[in-house]
């Protein structure tokens, strides 16, 4: 007998490419459809409750339908949800973001992380007058042409890290280096004088997580400064995920520009980019670098974001608690069959089991993971009532909503997995 989800997917395949609105959701043989989310639980349209370790791929650090955010949204709805004019709400969120990031003196809000990285790259080119950018192999910075080159996340999952339709003349301006390899960066910048910026996930969240080796980010900062290249930290995942101020505060490295998204919108669509005032003042209408958007700074996203960041700022102890919870999962996995088949990587509330003998240090090593073993593992954890991102190349997340009992259930699901 077919499930409701199976019926919906069959219908959706005739209405939308692949039956979904984003590729990673096309889970074989068919995805489950969600009816509601509450706390750390998703309830499918077929009535199954799943402990959620995907959390919409990162935004929901407070879990689903968090009361303070829900109340803020409900209150704002009474006053409207889109004005097309400035509002108090964007000023408040800007103040919060700037206060939390010493590197950010001015900020522009957009509607997605992809828009944020696209605009930050344009701004870097406008500020420096240079044409090329450098990205890290396997780094994912959204689905726009300049960065769909050896891209991680769903692009690697589907085997299309270099997308069709991206013009070769554009791609030649996107240079690449391996992660955790400062010598390769130094060599590349020594040979190319027309580089405007390096864009990098300080912690590779869209292929892992893959963690920076000791002093790597400091060396990156030193090398880019020496070659007069702007450093853009893509903190769409790590912003407010690792703590107030993100990876740049965690690792003590100051970028020139920062991109944010996910958590800063409290679960509603948002993106942002910011940095030194002298750079940001080139953005229109203050300067000649154009960026605009109908939904930029919309009051609903601003309100949800402000409520989320205010709660996080007032409860910073949760970051230590989340770190303890991923440690508990790691300790449970170590002596299990799953642990014997892979390497557990974690940082704060980010975690992943890579099906390879050691934690990957770059994109090439991550791609050497056994994706067949991962699929077998993923199927078993789903049957145990745990929803993990359905790709070896996506990060798992925890939220403040996960209870001790749910952490134990996640650990038990990992321990119970068996392999042929």
Swiss-Prot record:
Its keywords, alphabetically, are:
Cytoplasm, Isomerase, Porphyrin biosynthesis, Pyridoxal phosphate
> What EC number(s) does its UniProt record assign?
5.4.3.8
Query: Which molecular function terms from Gene Ontology are attached?
Result: glutamate-1-semialdehyde 2,1-aminomutase activity; pyridoxal phosphate binding; transaminase activity
Location in the cell reads: Cytoplasm
* Gene3D superfamilies per UniProt: Aspartate Aminotransferase, domain 1, Type I PLP-dependent aspartate aminotransferase-like (Major domain)
Reaction(s) catalysed by this chain, per the record, are: (S)-4-amino-5-oxopentanoate = 5-aminolevulinate
The annotated pathway is: Porphyrin-containing compound metabolism; protoporphyrin-IX biosynthesis; 5-aminolevulinate from L-glutamyl-tRNA(Glu): step 2/2
Q: Per the record's keyword annotation, is Transferase included, yes or no?
A: no
The UniProt entry, under Pfam families, shows: Aminotran_3
The protein's matches in InterPro entries, at most eight in alphabetical order, are given as:
4pyrrol_synth_GluAld_NH2Trfase, Aminotrans_3, Aminotrans_3_PPA_site, PyrdxlP-dep_Trfase, PyrdxlP-dep_Trfase_major, PyrdxlP-dep_Trfase_small
Gene Ontology biological-process annotations: protoporphyrinogen IX biosynthetic process
**Cofactor requirements of the protein:** pyridoxal 5'-phosphate
Q: List the GO terms this entry assigns under cellular component, sorted alphabetically.
A: cytoplasm
Q: Family per UniProt?
A: Belongs to the class-III pyridoxal-phosphate-dependent aminotransferase family. HemL subfamily.
**What is the designated name of this protein?**
Glutamate-1-semialdehyde 2,1-aminomutase
Q: Which source organism?
A: Methanosphaerula palustris (strain ATCC BAA-1556 / DSM 19958 / E1-9c)
Please name the taxonomic classification of the source. Archaea, Methanobacteriati, Methanobacteriota, Stenosarchaea group, Methanomicrobia
Q: Which gene encodes it?
A: hemL
């Amino acid at each position: 007998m077919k499930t409701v989800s199976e019926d919906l997917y069959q219908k959706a395949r005739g209405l939308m490419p692949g039956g979904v609105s984003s590729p990673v959701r096309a889970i074989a043989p068919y995805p489950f459809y969600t009816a509601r989310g509450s706390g750390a639980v998703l309830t499918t349209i077929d009535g199954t409750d799943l402990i959620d370790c995907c959390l919409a791929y990162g935004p929901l650090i407070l879990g689903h339908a968090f009361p303070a955010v829900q109340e803020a949204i409900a209150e704002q709805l009474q006053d409207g949800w889109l004005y097309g004019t400035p509002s108090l709400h964007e000023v408040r969120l800007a103040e919060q973001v700037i206060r939390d990031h010493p590197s950010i003196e001015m900020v522009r809000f957009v509607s997605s992380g992809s828009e944020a990285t696209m605009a930050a790259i344009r701004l870097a080119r406008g500020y420096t007058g240079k044409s090329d950018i450098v990205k890290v192999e396997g780094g994912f910075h959204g689905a726009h042409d300049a960065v769909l080159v050896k891209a991680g996340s769903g692009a690697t999952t589907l085997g299309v890290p270099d997308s069709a339709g991206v013009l070769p003349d554009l791609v030649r301006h996107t240079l690449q280096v391996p992660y955790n390899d400062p010598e390769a960066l130094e060599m590349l910048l020594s040979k190319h004088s027309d580089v405007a910026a390096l864009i990098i996930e300080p912690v590779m969240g869209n292929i892992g997580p893959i963690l920076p080796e000791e002093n790597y980010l400091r060396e990156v900062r030193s090398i880019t400064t020496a070659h007069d290249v702007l450093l853009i930290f893509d903190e769409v995942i790590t912003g407010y995920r690792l703590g107030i101020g993100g990876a740049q505060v965690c690792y003590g490295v100051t970028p020139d520009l920062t991109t944010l998204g996910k958590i800063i919108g409290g679960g509603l669509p948002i993106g942002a980019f910011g940095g030194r005032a002298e750079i940001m003042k080139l953005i229109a209408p203050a300067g000649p670098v154009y960026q605009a958007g109908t939904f930029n700074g919309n009051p609903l996203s601003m309100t949800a974001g402000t409520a989320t960041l205010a709660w996080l700022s007032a409860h910073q102890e949760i970051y230590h608690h989340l770190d303890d919870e991923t440690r508990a999962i790691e300790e449970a996995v170590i002596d299990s069959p799953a642990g014997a088949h892979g390497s557990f990587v974690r940082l704060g509330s980010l975690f992943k089991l890579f099906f390879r003998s050691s934690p990957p240090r770059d994109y090439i090593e991550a791609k050497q993971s056994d994706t067949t073993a991962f699929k077998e593992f993923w199927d078993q954890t789903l049957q145990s009532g745990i929803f993990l991102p359905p790709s070896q190349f996506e990060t798992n997340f925890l939220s403040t909503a996960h209870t001790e009992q749910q952490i134990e259930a996640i650990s038990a699901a990992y321990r119970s997995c068996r392999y042929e």
